[in-house]
Amino acid sequence: MVDSQYYLPNDIGVSALECGEAFRLLSPQEKMYAHYLSRAAWYGGLAVLLQTSPESVDIFVLLQKIFRRQAPAELEKVATAAGLSSEDYQAFLVYAAGLYANMGNYKSFGDTKFIPNLPKFKALVWASQAFQEQSTEMEALWNSCSCLLYSLEDRQKQLGLGDKGITTYFSGNCCLEDAEVAQKFLDSKKLSAYNTRLFKKDNGGKVCYEVRLASAVQKDCAVEGECESCCGNYSFEDKEFIVRRGDYAPLMEKVCSYLQQAEVYAANENQKKMIEEYRRSFTLGSIEAHKEGSRYWIKDKGPIVESYIGFIESYRDPFGSRGEFEGFVAVVNKAMSERFAKLVSSAEVLLPELPWPREFEKDKFLKPDFTSLDVLTFAGSGIPAGINIPNYDDIRQSEGFKNVSLGNVLAVAYSTKKEKLTFLEEADKDLFLKWKSPSFEVQVGLHELLGHGSGKLFVEDDKGKFNFDQSKVINPETGELVSSWYRGSETWDSKFSTIASSYEECRAECVGLYLCLNKQVLSIFGHEGQDAMDVVYVNWLSMVRAGLLGLEFYTPESKSWRQAHMQARFVILRVLLEAGEGLVGLEEVTGQDGKPDARITVDRSKIPTVGKDAINSFLRKLQVYKATADVEGGRALYDKYSTVSDSGAHNFLRLRETVLLRKEARKMFVQANTRVNGDNVELVEYEGNAAGLIRSFTERFQDDADQLEADLLQLNRRDAPCWLFELGSLLPPPGY
């Protein structure tokens, strides 16, 4: 019997992202700008299919062909005639919606595979109009993905590197050691891994690695500017490396084409130069060009239409260095943005409150934009609640960054309507319902601005110049002079690799917990007196509960975490439990249904004392290890609290089973499309259900659907042999 965690439930929450009012307030020029940026984002987002699993592209194309010819309502009649029950057909729609929402058949939040919860998938494919019209092509598509569609062999249950899971950031014969030597090579050439994939081959008995850059240009000829000398053959540590361009080339061409059209409607020179550099980046595979575009983006203060695009977050690279493509376009929510602007203005007063010496903070706080946005488009594998970007350490440290809170995402994702309030005491539930969303708004603001936006990295550049006084700065954890730092081209991601993402999320979450105790912060968000105290309590209670819920994202077989944020929250739960003195309670109980359950409690009177002291000490350690590039110390600390075992005061392995028993599926979002009609841009909205989500995707790519699908399949076929190592007999041979 298949574990239910690998199915998406038929009653999964699906909600439309409301952006109609914000869009209608835009000028005609702003609407055109938003439209073409959205098109660029959506086409680039298709690269995520190729970054997720070997079968994702084939499943996507199969579904597109079916739904382009028959909308969900029409296809339902065919399904009934083919012998599917209404529950079976709903399961089919939910699976298809899940594939679109996650841009692949692995959950974007948790990296677990999901499979169709119906046995008659093939019967429906064969009965579809698409099959009647193109039976040979549809049968070939089905044969190429049908085994992997349902397969739950141990390695295929989750994303991972080597024997820990599936990844298409690396060829199937790569392991952690290959990722490490490739990172050393990239560092030696001052190349970023963000827009690369790694393919390991045998060249006459000698190991050869291909580093492939995402670019529209496929030839490795010399071109003007950065990257002209990076492509070619190299020898490094007795291994061969080939750096070449052309990954996702047809998709990058579309991205560049739409960006060029968006540039015509840019509001200012910063936006124009930003887009020019993005185009250069996606044309040549140049991260340096993307960094330059990001600099112009930072300078573009307070735009009405905000956007960002590229290979951004490294959560899903098992090694933690390669970025998943994402692009968003959003409209500023002025009322909410005023609160965040006040928080930015208070940042220089709040930063000294953080528990590390002044030398461990940036020399100067570069006040960023911090806006609340209503999302029009968010292309990629999932939609976050807030963002702090760019992720380039050198820019963040000395030039600045931007923060955004995605208001319409928060309104839907963190709504308490229909939520199962698991693991809470009855006495806490009403308070939790009332303050969950407001408290999370405070946490997101602090997490993004003063979490990700705080803290210095100690660096020695290529010329031997230090950004700190190594003869005076004392490590507060040892009482001795700082003895380690980042050298040359080393970055936070390249040094801390596999734990970097989760560790940094944990640091930012701790900053949020710590500073939400500040009355000035609470006042900025409109909370005073008892209301402010309730917001603090629910914020801490939410974090503790999230730490328990995080166990869903731990895989005992490989002893690995599949989601950076949830690992971070579990770590914080462990820290607060360790603090003792009755601050946090966690006990296993029997539920009213007779099944295992659990209850968490937080003593609100001890949050400002025991709780604050515990976070103070832990947060200081996190920052010190990060600032000093102390990988050994940081990893030992983080691994200690990340451990999930059945020993000690709490049996977390058994609690994990309870969490899985009572888990609730993550919501999916339906996003609108934009369409040019003469001189106007129309917003096309869809119903908030699985059918609406499906329609949004089929209509999104209908203009050049046949060519696009052919391009995707060709890209996937080219690399099919590279996945044979990890998929074994399940993957048909090349040429299928």
Language-model features, listed with the residues they occupy:
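Contiguous, non-catalytic segments that form substrate-binding/exosite surfaces or channel walls
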Residues: L93-A96, Y100-F440
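N-terminal-proximal low-complexity accessory segments that begin disordered
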Residues: V2-E74
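Extended, compositionally biased alpha-helical segments that mediate assembly or anchoring
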Residues: K595-L724
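Active-site recognition of the HExxH zinc-binding catalytic motif
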Residues: S27, N268, F440-K463, E480, ...
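Short, glycine/acidic-rich hinge or "gate" loops at secondary-structure transitions
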Residues: E76-A79, E269-E276, D461-N467, V521-L541, ...
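Long, well-structured alpha-helical subdomains associated
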Residues: C19, V48, W492-K495, I499-C506, ...
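Glycine-aromatic micro-motifs
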Residues: L724-Y736
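Post-HEXXH active-site segment of zinc metalloproteases
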Residues: G455-E504
